From Swiss-Prot:
Disulphide bonds in the chain: 258-292, 265-285, 274-289, 324-373
Modified how: N-glycosylated. Proteolytic cleavage might yield an active form.
Protein role: Protease. May regulate the surface expression of some potassium channels by retaining them in the endoplasmic reticulum.
Organism: Bos taurus
Protein name: Matrix metalloproteinase-23
Cited PANTHER family: MATRIX METALLOPROTEINASE (PTHR10201), MATRIX METALLOPROTEINASE-23 (PTHR10201:SF7)
Primary location: membrane
Glycosylated residue positions: 95, 151, 235, 319
Amino acid sequence: MGRGACVPSAASGAGDRARQLGAVLGALCLFPALVLLAWPGTPANGAGARVAQGDAAPQTSGVLASGSLGPPHPPVPRRRRYTLTPARLRWEHFNLTYKILSFPRNLLSPSETRRGLAAAFRMWSDVSPFSFREVAPEQPSDLRIGFYPVNHTDCLVSPLHHCFDGPTGELAHAFFPPHGGIHFDDSEYWVLGRTRYSWKKGVWLTDLVHVAAHEIGHALGLMHSQHGRALMHLNATLRGWKALSQDELWGLHRLYGCLDRLFVCASWARRGFCDTRRRLMKRLCPSSCDFCYEFPFPTVAATPPPPRTKTKLVPEGRNVTFRCGQKILHKKGKVYWYKDQEPLEFSYPGYLALGEAHLSIIANAINEGTYTCVVRRRQRVLSTYSWRIRVRS
């Protein structure tokens, strides 16, 4: 992909601008399954190999202890995210095409790569109205897949699309609809089979099907799931869950609807049949849809913006950075960021870059809204700042 795939260009035409509006939304990353394989009696407190945490906490680094017989220790599980994107980004059609722009240089042949990706796509097409078809690289497609080195596409010039980090770090990232980009780190050792540590090669062998299925979920509009056994869980590779769970189905159906055979279940649920006609709903409505299920999104205490909110009218495509009072941070306060009262916990490449005391976004119609930073020390609010962003066409 050429430059500008993630960040709108001021010189783009009207058609490109509409496409780039969706392209600016971020990729989510999947990290390696650093499964602990310690021998009996081996201490479990050795330092792990470098694990990049590109969309979460600061990076950790270290080297394997000289006396250790186990591979790198697993990263500490991190906090969970919403299941759907903030703007509920989705595809407007179900017959999606994909093309493979480059293949891995380690271990897998092109034919094996195609077979692994096709298996990952089948995991989603078997439980959804989507169908996926590969097309030639020179043809237009909805999804574009590639195996890339550290410096790929526009990662060096884009503040919101990060580069890869080499082996045993970030495995892949995918962009929300309608961008369609799915990038795999070509420094990894991809295989068809379970993720495992190779003592002979001294590297991790990573299951392509597992990682690809996770990234396809992001490309369809799903974020990380809260369910511990979901394929879309933040640490799915670490935990080893490979099958799609009911949680992914509910997330997918919230975005695209669930096509029940009689096309009546949704209206029955609205009429109260979940309480008054439970047997009827159970007998005629697909259990995978579960129209009576209320998805348990995480909730946080509402944080209204301060009385004085700065309004900024920004040209479309401009990079906007908010800074949350450096002086107040010296009082050992912790910064919390919100958009329209929803918490922002992680950076999303191509969407926003989140630092301790600053937040950067690309101005576009979807990123319009009110951004608030709250500095707290324990339960006490030390300071608040708020900005309202409006895009000038």
